[in-house]
């Protein structure tokens, strides 16, 4: 009984179709603790026929039958047991079935897996074929879809099971014309009446096509073509289960020695093939077989496989029977090599690296994913050429092969280059079939040839192609009679000894979607070509063993190949003696030449050689911060050793064109700046991920053993020792800088002393040795004005740690000064000038504060560096033509903005101009700054007037601004009184006061203000003044999730008072806090200017359905509150609500077009569409709000009435009238003939009005029609009200929209043959709402056993399946 199972609070599925209630949920067996699926079916319709009651038992009978041991080969959800309750007549009332639980879930969960492989998709298809073959003469499933197929992970593989037999039908006993199934996967003939087991073929094809999008690895496109055939609408030409089985068996046989074999690598796929063959399911007459034809160079082949690679298409084909017969007749042959691999190169070969194979160089091809199974390759050398990587969809049984290359001029290239590879002569096939004839010399030739080819590619500096060779396991070796491959029809089967044949290599095209530049992992089994066979020479065993040792070390491929060739040459004498005159001499000649060239090259220290000798375990940390604008992912320099010399190698990611712009360092070397690191060269390697640039220096001897950095030792020092270390490093740094400034150096004839701060104009790096000595080197020449300023902060961060350094005010000063001084900003809206005395002025603060803190008497000996008069030496900032000394810099306590390149969106500056001092807030709105200097105009300089009656709001004294940056000046004496929202928790009052100020002074809306906190009640007793820094943009960022600037401030201000705005959202969301605060209530209810901000106060009464509530306002009025949209910027936060039916609303929205064309009043649209594109408050609505406003404007009666709408917690809600005295038609217990006619008449009137407005309700059903009877003037009258427009839409955009309740939907909504017509739906003659109304009336007539003939005739016309072909009844 069910007592042995414990329910788990996880309902998987629940549905009530009026006759039955189905609930599927997880349960746990109390004894073994295992999870199972419990399917409970309640049969609650007492009016159903005897036959329908008998059919109730079919599901568990089917499950029970196919769960028996005799059907163990079928992957069907396993029946465990069932429980039943029967009525007095013995019919089922309640059925509970316990089924095996599959932890992966259904196929819709496959998208959560990291990768779905082609072998999984093919195995799933084979598994379903086994089941459908078993069902063929007895059962039709009728509801195959992803939701009814379940999977579990079995190690790296997937296992699949077909479930939900509830829709299944017996072939013999049932007339198969019932509308059972799922819209998207339902075969068209089901709706037309009369169908066969081919409906399951259709559903399976649809399911497989939906799953292909999850496969990111290249897949044999023939299978997609096969799945397309399964979904042909004409079931007469749709393939049968027997045809499909014969095709896949033949496909497997023809693909055994090709790249297509990877499709069949699931461990159970081959057992299914064997099962089909043992049962002789794979035998069909020739005329019944499925064949895909392909035309290549005017010759037709039967196509077996189609793959798209990076720069090629590969087809596995078989010659047609006619061709085979003619050839056999001419050549008098018994068997012929009729299976070919034809490789079509998209681009002609750029270079032949060997006469034995042809190579396509792809160094400059960058792989780009377009999404789904579509992909493309864009050539960086020729960006106008795009190579498509997805096979064209087939039409019928024919494939047209072409190269799919087009450029912007529309040129088309076909058959750029073809390579014919005879599959029957491949190394793998010959070895497996004639292993006894594979002599030792043949084995050695194969190994030697593969190594030579790999070396030639590697020597051409293409590790990617070498890795491809290593990865393909010799699938590219073929036996041929002559150096060139003859045409396929001339290739004869091998009869002579294999040693008399030549081995040739074609390029090993790799079908896995490697992103360009990613190094293919070395396959340690690369040389093990013998597929478990005997290795017939010890040299090969030695090579394989060596390769297995070297593979895990991540060495460069060329180094591995040199090692292997050296081993081969040690046995040259033995090999040539043992296998004389067998053609091995040519290989040893090549090997000796390779080693000779490598020895000659060792005398020259090449850049590539030094890079190859990098020891990744030996690296030195560099002080960060001097390479802004480039990747800082590698914060170390690496050490390379060669012949006793040590080299420092720095690297960064190569950006195409960057190295050409930055001239090689050797052209601009500054010897004196480079005195610690002697520059060698710069080397670009594009074979690694996106390419790397290596800068090579000679490593100073004092750094050779500095693998352990002082950073680690600093972490254990106390603060006093850290201060000493920092002062020592600063002394070295400043002394070095001073020496450069005091001497004359020339760079390419240019006098550096004529340049101010020349040292800071070049990007350099700092290295600190174990002895705390500073060393410098330049990675490349580039301008960076902030280098020197930033260096003080970075050295401090290195000593104190990233967190503690921010506590040292003087160092934070340099960080913020660097933000102002950065090359991106210094020449734009403001500029900062700084010189040597200015730097020392701020550093002196650190020296003196340290000495005072630790009781030290006087400066140490190194203080002689301060040889300048430091009195009143400041850095200064130019704002337009006004100059201010920078007395101090700091950041307020606000949440950092991580979206900016620098965290420089807000800096507080203490400035001095003559005798006047100011507190200045510098606000930067965008990280990308305008390159035009600020021109001061009357509009730029805005003096402010603080003589207003609002003593709470303190406005700036002066504002200087452009479109990107603004400077707000306040009284200097307020500098110690500033707080932020993070410091103080009175946001609600501050916001409301600020809004109050905006309403009275709109021109001040976009300025930064200070709010006097002492005037709030709880702060009146505070002795010291406190002012809250208030920035409306910062508030928008925190409350609304956006950081932007408003192009039209006036529009923004006017939007604040609209029903849907930042303000109304904030107030409604924080309603409880605001209503608990007397001060907030006073602002909202006693100030007339704030009256439109009053919140909507209501209580929830009950939830009617998801996102729909009955609510009551403070005046006891009842409403229906429905979710209708959301604030667009908060999309990620409200995804959980499910907004499939909500569309973007913009100025180009088609609703405006409808309004204009029909002459409607569009006042109700203005609040939705008259918005600037840059406005923060862009919304997403469903159509319900717009449609209800239109119907309200038109005064349409008997339809759900819109009362109002509001926004809360970023969600837009609409309020409609609550019809408490009505009942929906599904709830009503009694209707008579007059009632049904009244419903028809009133609903027809409403639909006619909706049609005139081009509105389609789309969900007419009993639950959405309200009905009541009332007495008027002594007479009983019936009233009907149509509600729930949540999925309603305008006519001309209805195509392919399948929303709605299936039972009441017109067939054209979900049947493919009626979808996607060329003409708009408005030009077609069907009436989908009429169909739904007809089906509703049909349901009510059956429910209440009321069938007046006239009404029956009308309803029959309303629900004709092909209603669009017939003349509709007049409404």
UniProtKB/Swiss-Prot annotation:
Leading EC class: transferase
UniProt keyword list: ATP-binding, Kinase, Nucleotide-binding, Repeat, Serine/threonine-protein kinase, Transferase
Pfam families listed in its UniProt record: Pkinase
Binding site for ATP: 15-23, 39
Domain of life: Eukaryota
TM region(s), chain numbering: none
Domain Protein kinase, chain residue ranges per copy: 9-269, 1131-1371
Family: Belongs to the protein kinase superfamily. Ser/Thr protein kinase family.
Full protein name: Probable serine/threonine-protein kinase DDB_G0293292
Protein species of origin: Dictyostelium discoideum
